[in-house]
UniProtKB/Swiss-Prot annotation:
This is Ferrochelatase. GO terms for molecular function: ferrochelatase activity; metal ion binding. It comes from the Bacteria. InterPro entries: Ferrochelatase, Ferrochelatase_AS, Ferrochelatase_C, Ferrochelatase_N. It is an enzyme of class 4 (lyase). It catalyses: heme b + 2 H(+) = protoporphyrin IX + Fe(2+). It is found in: Cytoplasm. One of its GO terms (cellular component) is cytoplasm. Pathway: Porphyrin-containing compound metabolism; protoheme biosynthesis; protoheme from protoporphyrin-IX: step 1/1. Coiled coil: none annotated. The lineage of its organism: Bacteria, Bacillati, Cyanobacteriota, Cyanophyceae, Oscillatoriophycideae. It comes from Trichodesmium erythraeum (strain IMS101). GO terms for biological process: heme biosynthetic process.
């Protein structure tokens, strides 16, 4: 019988305060998180952002105990899935591949090769597909597979997304129902779905299906819930000056409060494990915001973690994937290429394309010089008294 492995993919998170800065550097070094026209800028910009943000981020992690519980929860999920599969008659080895912190995806692949796995199911712990979550991990795996002859011997299949799985939806409905039942006025509770946001350009220009899958998921949950409570979908955790999917969670909370909502139940729709965005951003920041805005009762649905209905459904999903035709990384990477076409000789401003390329390069050099001067406090702008 073939040796079967299950590779669970997730984001990763700093386990202690000292991990925060390198974790942020890894995160912002990913071109799917911050997309730049020049790849050589990725690492310097990641260093700059992680240097500027890590102290604030450390403060946030202090508020939830000094580190992320994501690794330990993912390990619990892996064990629960393995036990469920064993009950269904399938013996497997479980592996965890985090994108930005230990155990890194590369570490998981080293174990997979060492333990001579012959069949591998790759399961992202993101219900909805996005080029910045599952897609980023799939592209990394694709690159690693291409240059490793040992990996090429492994028969693998990829599960791109599973946002409409019946067990996932049912588990979410059960958790929402439990919270509604604890409210003194369950019919008056406004159900507030909060998903991690992505830049609008990912959806409109790169063809990311994330927003559509989130909306489909919310619609399916509400239909299964079969209640008359009003509901809202909003997006949290945006970074940087570009436009992200709207409405933003903080704006939507204030708008609902201004409209007279007093009971709010927040449902973290794109997260299956407790981590910084549920424990700190929702439980602390958004709770304070809601109370200041006039919301009297703020509730939050817990993350799925090892909910038995959810775990059983993931085990079924693995079994189905093994029986179905295999899907490779190219099938799973759902991103269309957008190519902006310009005249070959001149752009609309009358400049040659070569001149525009050099203008762009010089602009980026100037940008990096400005960043360096802001960080060090030395340079021509300081000398001239402009900074």
């Amino acid at each position: 019988m073939s040796r079967v492995g299950i590779l669970l993919l997730n984001l990763g998170g700093p386990e202690q305060l000292e991990d925060v800065r390198p974790f942020l550097f890894n995160l912002f070094s990913d071109p799917e998180i911050i997309r730049l026209p020049f790849p050589w800028l990725q690492k310097p910009l990641a260093w700059f952002i992680s240097t500027m943000r890590f102290q604030k981020s450390q403060e946030n992690y202090k508020e939830i105990g000094g580190g992320s519980p994501l690794r330990s929860i993912t390990e619990e999920q892996a064990l629960a899935i393995q036990q469920q599969l064993e009950q269904k008659g399938l013996l497997t080895q479980m592996y965890i591949g985090m994108r930005y912190w230990h155990p890194f995806t590369e570490e998981a692949l080293t174990r997979i090769k060492r333990e001579q796995v012959e069949k591998l199911v790759i399961l992202p712990l993101y219900p909805q597909y996005s080029i910045s979550t599952s897609g980023s991990s799939f592209r990394l795996l694709d690159k690693l597979w291409e240059k490793d002859s040992e990996l090429k011997k492994i028969e693998y299949t990829v599960i791109p997304s599973w946002h409409q799985r019946p067990g996932y939806v049912q588990a979410m409905v059960e958790l929402i129902t439990q919270q509604l039942d604890q409210s003194p006025n369950p019919d008056q509770v406004h159900i507030f779905f909060s998903a991690h946001g992505v830049p609008v350009s990912y959806v409109e220009e790169a063809g990311d299906p994330y927003q559509a899958e989130i909306e489909e998921c919310v619609d399916k949950i509400m239909k299964t819930l079969n209640c008359s409570n009003p509901h809202t979908l909003a997006y949290q955790s945006r970074v940087g000056p570009v436009e992200w999917l709207k409405p933003y969670t903080e704006d939507a909370i204030e708008e609902l409060a201004a409209g007279g909502v007093k009971d709010l139940l927040v449902v973290p729709i794109s997260f299956v494990s407790e981590h910084i965005e549920t424990l700190q951003e929702i439980d602390i920041e958004y709770r304070e915001l809601a109370e200041e805005a006039g919301i009297s009762n703020f509730y939050r649905v817990p993350a799925l973690n090892t909910h038995p209905v959810f775990i059983n459904d993931l085990a079924d999903l693995v079994m189905e994937a093994l029986d179905a035709p295999s899907r490779d990384f190219s099938d799973a990477i759902q991103m269309k290429k957008i190519i902006k076409m310009y005249p070959q000789e001149r752009w609309q401003w009358g400049l040659t394309t070569t001149a525009e390329v050099w203008n762009g390069r010089l602009a980026m050099v100037g940008f990096m010089a400005l960043l360096l001067e802001l960080i060090t406090g030395y340079g021509p702008l300081h000398f001239a008294g402009l900074l």
